């Protein structure tokens, strides 16, 4: 974000982010990564220092304060590079440690940037002064910004939470923690302010209508003053410290609108009510009341305005400088009003507050000679009792003589003064705490609105970790809370980190850091933990703090690593045990913990409170039950537990609720830091800040970050910044992907490659590696800058020296001129010249003055004329301006209409998006319902099984009961045991009843959820969870019943006692059995109903899916219509922009009209007419746009109606479900039917198994057929091998091949199957690609035709526009003469233009008709393509036969190749000397390297060719690829059969001639054969057989080897000759080059012939296709023209009035026809010229090829010439296609002209018939030319076929040329080495000669310059001498 983007933050910008200048200054400061470090310091924790020396594991460094220190090397931590100074996210620091974090916060705080990110944290430091960063301008700037798009701020955290809530549909929470005074409360208020502002935007109208109660936003904001008044107080660190924790939930609707809010509070500091330290004070409300701002309060509460009159609130300070208690009282009272408190409620709260103050003033004294207390005055007690609505005497009696319960009786107990004082304080604290809780509940009731709410954002404001010298029970609760929150953060943080790694594809082993704190948490909250032991001790009356300590040590000391025995230090409070928290070790003092945990009250006084006449007080204590409260029968257990709930248990319960809330939300973390204890702005106390960083988990988060990869950079940014480290890794000229570039760059650097990972979009670094890269980058930059500086200094010095030389030369010239002037200034003629010169100028001046006067008169006259002209123009300009204003008004109206249309279009788009969202949501719901249905079906089956088991259990139970009837004798104790067991059964039955009700509620809930479709997904998920829980409970109950049955069986053996008692128990058991039966039946009914419901929901789901498909189809239609609407709108927008541009141009021209001429006025009028035309076009486009929008609206209304119908259907389905519910309850036979269905399904499965077996047998038969086909292929392969053996005349080797193939049969069978499968896949892919290619070509042709038609329509419209312009010009001339006549003509022209626009629309409709006909043609062509595919399959069947023919053809070609090779060898022998003497080093070097590669390739090809079996399989695999080529060859072979027969006859003659040579080569081959066999012996027997099958190839190799031997001998001879005379070699080289160039002409001529024939072939094919298309287009256009002609004849009468105008147009049309005719002829000439240029280019290409001197490079080019020719052919085809398109355009133009002529014929009636006949004759001529062209194309097709055959021959010849040229590479092998050496020597000598020559030339040049200067100087001297002599003689003569 640059400085310009920061401007949106206004005055807050400097407090949020550094400016660009500051960032540059920080980055350019001096820095040394190896020396700049942090060292530990006793006072400052860490200080910056520079390393001086290293020695023996220790480092000596100088701190920034100038102090020299020596520390261990492992204590030194590196500083971060300047790039990271004041970084906004500390997780991005490359060196992530404590001092780096501390100093980053310190530097940002010094710049007043108080917010900083630390990974997931936002750390904020209290500035202790007001900063302008919370204004409305800042709120608006942060709204909708992502975290990365704006500087750190609490508003950014808030907005991200709000946006996540809306987008992710998930509840959010913001956790704000920190010590007192760190700014938690302020930040909480800012968060609430932000939500109230952004969520209430757009709802302002309600604010104006609300009464004094205030809007919801106001109430949420005003809740803070009320809470602060009763819950905040001044502390040592903070003047407005919150003494309670709070969790504020702000609820929002589905659209993000504020719905409601509620507040939960934690750990209110009750002790502050009665006790404060010296520097602190009580809660604000006490001092606000005493401020006397509302005197009526003082009277009502019976108090003064002096705080020191009241003991409870005057123990510390009573005033705070930064707080105005009077104003705060008014704010509190106003908050109560806004929150809707009644006057009675406000007064009751004030009364209780005043009563507490009076409570503290009540005094008691000890009775004489007794230990009992008595009141010391009753005045304060009377006031307190009055305010509380109590009796004063009863209050005092209850305090001094409380009644306690002893046994079943109440007795009065005496209290001493200390006990009374404690009871008094406890009662005051209880009253205040309950009043505070009531106020919070009352605020929640106000904020609870009836508006629908979907999500909430929770704001947690709670105290941070506390480690004091004296830590008590309150600190344990706070620290336990923070331990849980830190565990929550750790788990959440690393889960997100892991998700980032997973998303980026980083391999990572999960580490659950949340478990790090589990040991400490378990120690506190688990059974037998600290809290549990504390609560246990509170239950024992004789327990003390010391017994509590003893239990702690017995259970945990030595057993838990987190529990330790403290070390007591003198001067510090005593500690009883220590806990190791994540923030550090805390020593706790347990004194008073039991009392604090029980928090007892004087129950006598509490009973008085319950009976108070003050309604609020009685309500506060109405639900209080003391420890001795009566226990009601049957419910005593619950009552007792609730009454004796300890503080620790209540805190744990609230904490668990809080953690549950937080786990269900997406959390955001804010950590508040207090910078110093003195509240000084801008001062950082390092130890204090470090302590808080440890306590609030920032450093813990850093520890987690260091385990992973904390630094990450996008690939593009990394490449851009660090490419300088190794530019060679990422070359500048070529494109390399950013990720690949980063990988190459990092792999090329000398760094640990385990320190980074590559993700999908980023590169991840371990901590410290990025700093190392920065250091390397700085070093690299310093070297580069040093080099640049040196070069720059050199350039500057040379420039300065050049200036000095130029200055010297200038001085010399000036000196020479001055000397010359001094020599001639006294010369008499010169003096005369000085006198006459001014006179000459004065005469010239007079002449100039005369001419200027004449010019002035003439200009004055012209000025008067121009002035008159200007006035005339001004008058005209006024009228034009008026017209322009009218036009602007019209344009504005059109723009308004367009804006309305755009708004409607936007609305349609929004509706479409909403529909898409609904469709998506419904799809998701359907998927969830299907999943639920599947799960419920499975559960249903499971429950059915369980029901059957239960039935069996019941049967067993009946048998057991029958046996029990016979068992009589048992003791009464056994009967009692049985009774207890039956009571357990009662409980089980009660549980089952509850579960049944829960199931019914879940069922009803599911039905309700069906009504509300928006909540269906969530409610179904909840119902699923509930059902799973119920199923688990049922399983548990079944297990219990099984246990009961076992117990009963055991009891059966024992129950042989009393028959009467057992009979009674039997009766009870029978009743229980009946009840269980009834419940099980009901359970069955319910399960059946659920199953029916599931089936209905499945049916409903299928219906919804159908509806969804219909909606999707409708949405697609809407999208297509919207796309059309967008295109129309784009056209209108373009037209509007053109109009605006034209309007601006007219305005500019009108402004410059003062100097305009009549031509400019005409232009303005012309533009005006164009505006009229465009305005009418815009109006028509707008009407069309509105019609389209109306259609879209109609379709949208239809879709909405359909959705409504769907909702109605759903309602009907719901009613149907409710009706069928009762019917399905009676269907008990479903289980049996299900069994029958299962049996049927089993039978079906057996049938399916049989069918599968049949299919398997069919597949086996197919496999056998495949095996037979493989065997056939194997036999064919053997046959081919036999043929090869016969051709090579080696029968013995053939027999070995057959035996070898027999052994490899099994292996090749599998290979053939694989290859056959690959062949089928490739054939399918090829067919699909061919089909797609044809379709694409056809579509392309259609699109091209449509484009051409649109272009023609556009040209037609342009012609109409130009015609309209000419008509406007005529009307304008008429308007100047006669305004009335001009008006009529304009009206007629308007009608004419309207008619023409209508014609254009009809033309568009005709184009649409063409499109439909093209679509039909497309379908027809697709059918043809399918037929062609059938033909292709047939051709595949003939592939085997063609393969055999191809091999025979290959034999013939091989013989011709052999003949060509022999002729080529003869040619080579004549060129040996030329090639051996070739010394063109650079070309030979490249060609030699390439030739080596080709040689290796050739050898590999020989080896591959020798593998005959693999060749055969490869041919099978590649046959699919060459199907089309084989088809062409098949056609060519039939045509070339006769030619080949004649060629065979010639070949036989040549073969006889070559047999002798073959025999000689055979002898030499036998010698080399042994060596080849030795090389091939390592291969398989397959290689041996293949070698024999290719003897002819080996023969050719033998000839090449022979040539190589001869060339080697020749090379030795040439070597000696070259050593003798290098100059003679160069002469021979040039001669050899010429010979080589001539030798290559034959190859090039063949290539040129191939090129020409290929071009002709492709041109003919393309021309044929184009002609076919043209014929179809012409036919369709003729039909359209005939239809249009009939329509035009109907409007003859309407066009009669424009006959004169039509005559003029006819003349213009005839001229255009002539012009187009001339253009057509010129295009034909141009085509011929281009053909000539093409042939010339071909000849130039041939000449360029002939200039190639290197034989090897020529061979390479011979191989690649085919591709080059194909490219050139493509270019020429494009040119031809372009010419054909031009031709079609001309034909279309002719058709258009014919159409125009028909039009003109109807307009002109008789006058235009002759012209029409001429045009028709011209059209017929063009048609004749078209026929001639078609005949030519037919002839070219015939020539094309001949050329194809010739191309094939040339292709084979070219391939042989390539192979021969490759063989030649070995011939120059050793020669090149010598040539290189000689060439190198020659180059060195030449280089030395060039050097000497350049030196000589330089000296020669300097000598010539010196001679020239000497000559010039000498000539000057001679001239001067001559002049001096002349002057001397003249002086003598004068004397």
From Swiss-Prot:
Entry annotated with the keyword Coiled coil: yes
Myosin motor domain: residues covered: 85-778
Bias type Basic and acidic residues, positions: 1923-1935
Transmembrane annotation, as ranges: none
General function of this protein: Myosins are actin-based motor molecules with ATPase activity essential for muscle contraction. Forms regular bipolar thick filaments that, together with actin thin filaments, constitute the fundamental contractile unit of skeletal and cardiac muscle.
Extra information: The cardiac alpha isoform is a 'fast' ATPase myosin, while the beta isoform is a 'slow' ATPase.
UniProt name for this protein: Myosin-7
Gene that specifies this protein: MYH7
